């Protein structure tokens, strides 16, 4: 979590500069239409903050530095050992712990944000390739319900091949109905 949010700022700034848009990250964020993404950029990415205790925010840099020095290498080691020991090409798990809610200001609250990324956050912070496959639509929300696959470091192409094979098994979902 600290790695992805902290690096989102730098990566977006680099992208905007390299692509020659002439826009700043703040200008791009001003035009974000999705309330949850806008909330994340305005509340966390641009000010370089992370969710803290009791619905507060804290400076991201100390947590990022600690993650890069200690937590990330330990997580990468754990994943590497898990994939090797169990001879796995991928780990499969639900993308999110519950059916997504519609995009609105509450969907980007710190509590909801943390809850919705909790399953995908470890692999992301370890720098692993990940692939999300929509499998069904929620009964009432009609929003996609997905399965996530994380692969060993450097297995991007193999993970895509696995995803394409699974698409043959599960098929493709129709687009959610327009609201």
Predicted regions and their residues:
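Glycine-rich phosphate-binding loop signature in dinucleotide/nucleotide-binding domains
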Residues: 84-87
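Short helix-loop capping/hinge segments that flank enzyme active sites or metal/cofactor-binding pockets
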Residues: 6-76, 89, 134-144
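Structural helix-boundary/capping segments
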Residues: 14-21, 57, 125-179
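Short, surface-exposed loop/helix-turn segments at secondary-structure junctions
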Residues: 64, 100-117
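Acidic helix-start/capping segments at beta-turn-to-alpha-helix junctions
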Residues: 1-4
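Small-aliphatic-rich amphipathic alpha-helix that forms the alpha element of a beta-alpha
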Residues: 78-81, 110-134
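Glycine-rich, N-terminal phosphate-binding loop of Rossmann-like dinucleotide-binding domains
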Residues: 95
């Amino acid at each position: 979590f600290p790695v992805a949010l902290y690096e989102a700022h730098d990566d977006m700034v680099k992208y905007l500069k390299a692509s020659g848009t002439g826009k700043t990250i703040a200008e791009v964020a001003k035009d974000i239409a999705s309330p949850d993404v806008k909330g994340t950029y305005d509340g966390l990415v641009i000010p370089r903050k992370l969710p803290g205790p009791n619905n507060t925010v804290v400076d991201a840099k100390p947590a990022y530095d600690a993650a890069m020095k200690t937590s990330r290498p330990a997580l990468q080691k754990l994943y590497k050992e898990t994939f090797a020991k169990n001879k796995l090409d991928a780990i499969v798990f639900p993308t999110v712990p519950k059916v997504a809610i519609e995009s609105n200001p509450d969907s980007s609250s710190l509590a909801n944000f943390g809850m919705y990324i909790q399953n995908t956050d470890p692999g992301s912070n370890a720098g692993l390739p990940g692939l999300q496959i929509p499998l069904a639509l929620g009964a009432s929300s009609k929003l996609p319900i997905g399965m996530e696959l994380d692969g060993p470091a450097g297995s991007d192409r193999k993970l895509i091949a696995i995803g394409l094979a699974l698409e043959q098994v599960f098929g493709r979902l129709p687009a959610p109905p327009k609201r």
